[in-house]
A protein has these predicted regions:
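Ligand-binding beta-strand-loop-alpha-helix segment within the catalytic cores
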Residues: 1-2
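Sparse, context-dependent recognition of short Cys/His-centered cofactor- or disulfide-binding micro-motifs
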Residues: 5, 46-48, 62, 68, ...
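General beta-strand structural signal in soluble alpha/beta enzymes
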Residues: 8-10, 36-39, 56, 85, ...
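Conserved short-loop catalytic and cofactor-binding motifs
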Residues: 11, 61, 83
């Protein structure tokens, strides 16, 4: 109400599983104007840093947050050529088991803490611990 501009900065893109979306809804509901400036989604940045394309040719891709449940992840793995699994750190061991059972662990790239000091981008390492900002790109391969 003091005629000031404020900024809310987020990692990745504000439109993809960002806490910022909830804050923006409250700000709009309170009667304030907003402007959203797009960012680079973490999985796009991670794929570029890993040197892998997310999709090629006629391949399909799903983006699934692990907090939506392991069944959602399994469904995506069953129905899409490539799957991005976001916010994977909390249940990573259970996820390794699913990927092992489906023979997909060696087709998985891990992006952990992209752009941060402790960034890890590389193959799945079941002995390594991963945090909240962990994204997996599972490339099953498919239609070219």
């Amino acid at each position: 109400d003091e005629n000031r501009d404020i900024a809310l900065i987020t990692l990745g893109d504000v439109s993809i599983y960002s806490t910022c979306a909830y804050v923006l809804k409250m700000v709009v509901k309170a009667g304030y104007q907003i402007q959203i400036i797009p960012g680079i989604p973490s999985f796009c940045s991670g794929a570029a840093l890993a040197g892998i394309p997310l999709v090629e040719g006629r391949e399909s891709m799903a983006i699934v947050p692990l907090f939506s449940g392991m069944e959602s992840v399994k469904t995506a793995l069953d129905h899409f050529d490539n799957v991005v699994i976001m916010k994977a750190g909390s249940q990573i061991q259970a996820l390794w088991n699913v990927l092992l059972q489906q023979g997909l662990l060696d087709r998985t790239t891990v992006i952990c803490n992209a752009g941060m000091e402790d960034e890890y981008i590389g193959p799945a390492d079941v002995k390594r611990s991963y945090g909240y900002f962990t994204t997996l790109i599972v490339k099953k391969g498919g239609k070219k």
